[in-house]
Amino acid sequence: VNPVQFKISSTEEQTQVKGMTVFNTEQVNTKKQPMFFGKPLGIQRYDSYKYPVFDKLTTQQLGYFWRPEEVSLQKDRGDYQTLRPEQKHIYTSNLKYQIMLDSVQGRGPGMAFIPYCSLPELEACMEVWGFMEMIHSRSYTYIIKNIYSDPSEVFDTIITDERILERAKSVTESYDDFIQASQDYGSSNAWMHNLEKVSYAQQSLNDVKRKLYRAIANVNILEGIRFYVSFACSFAFGELKLMEGSAKIISLIARDENQHLAITQNILNKWRDGDDPEMKQIMKEEEEWTYKMFNRAVNEEKRWADYLFKDGSMIGLNDKLLQQYVEWIANRRLKAIGLKPQYDISANNNPLPWTQHWISSKGLQVAPQETEVESYVVGGIKQDVKKDTFSGFKL
């Protein structure tokens, strides 16, 4: 049987047929490209955008730059020795789980999404995203080295913890499915055949895009739900004036994760609005799957709360409150991406209202000499200064 001959009909298509490249030398109008699976990118220019929101998120992430060494953990080491066994269990278990999550996110966006990104502003946004996740992972090492006499007792037991491994599977399976499918697509001739509208190749790309949707949706759930039981526990220690340095670091991490959540929410909402008509259709078809994934995450976090408090609660926090909090958070995350809230809890009834000032650093008012100021923004400039802005100031 003679092999099928594919005629490449135009210069534009010939450019695409070259496949993935680190620098596309052809002119590309990125304002007309979808967010993913468009033409390869060339010049990294940040003066004109299809979606300015991604550049804004890049600027915000860079403005929030911080290092864990800025926060003293001297008091935390002493505090840890005074914790009851059940409190040590809560503190250490959450730390191990957060290490796993940020190990995934430290390499996930760069490994999975960036190679197929076709907008420079989104590419930059995700590059900074991965960099900030690396800071989070370094922060956990900083905490562990300062709190525990033997860091290996934490690190070496993460991948032997069945409860963490169960949740790791939920977190990573969609990532891995997309990475495998996209690499298979890129290493075959399917991308070339797709230019000639060959049906099998078009279906192949549709399958890859479906896996991309599932990966992004799962990351949205990770950033928006899976961290928050652990966050709440860290903040509860801080409210009790225990492990305050750790709570401050986790507060900085939570602030960053809100930025990363916004990245995934914007990607999903722009697909829903028609950035790529094929992705818009995939989103509709995958709606039931998305609800199932949200429900799976909520149930896993509820079981985690049971595990954390199996030996006792702490002042201001218990497993039931945490489980209500997870449902409240999940409803907000669903609504933010155009889906219907699924849990019977009022949007105005935050079960843990005191966590909000830890998540939003603007709510923290502290004297600089007493504790680390975490509301400082690097490179922040106020652009709307008027003649009367300082009218109330007196010298």
Segments (PLM) and residue ranges:
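Non-heme di-metal
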Residues: 2-395
